[in-house]
Amino acid sequence: MTNSLTAFTSPDLSSSSGSACELNGRYSSRAPKGVRAAEEFTRTRLSKSFFMRDFLFSEIAAIEGLSNLPGDPKLAIAAGRGLCENLLEPLQATFGRLAIRSAYRSPEVNGFGCSHRLSCASNEKNRARHTWDRRDKNGHMGALTTVVVPWLVDRMAEGITWQAMAWWIHDNLPYSELQFFPKLLAFNIGWHEAPKRTIYSFIAPRGFLTKPGFPNHDGDHSHLYRGFPGPATQ
């Protein structure tokens, strides 16, 4: 292994770092009401390159006229910062611009997607995953987004595989879970306070590439992603 695995940073919910989404020096724990409040919230900077607005678009919400704003902005911001600072920034610094696909989903949006078979897991399963402002059953926060890495898409014809990207992330980033999809080799990447360290594929043959307890989980996997760049210094 490259031995460059970054220790994850858990954001401080009590922080008041000058973000646009603050209420009396603290992030609001209530959903933004009205256009101006929503605009202020979406200006919240999550990391060097990412703002909250980058993660709020939803085709389901747009087509069905549903709200995709978090009910607990304070928690959503903290979880989003964990995702951006620990995973998305180092991934983008190494491979270039990321395309964000499905990211935050409100319970209303996710519940609609689940009940209408629109590729959404249940609201319970998406706590601390796509639903950033809901802790999981153990009280942990987390955040997940679907990304496309154009660097990877451009190299598919050269024989670069999703497994190579998966093992690079496994060796170099403090992710919680990865799930890979056939179209554009998009994948879910999740940050979590108690990382699971699992990699799953919806690309045939479907199943786990690795998870704790698998014989391939530990050790050096660099031979599986030869030619990949080393982690960039941010």
Regions found by a protein language model. Give the residues of each.
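N-terminal, Lys/Arg- and Ser/Thr-rich interaction peptides
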Residues: 2-4, 9-12, 16-73
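Cell-envelope/glycan interface and biosynthesis
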Residues: 59-170
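Catalytic cores and adjacent binding grooves of peptidoglycan-active enzymes
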Residues: 6-8, 12-16, 23, 132-234
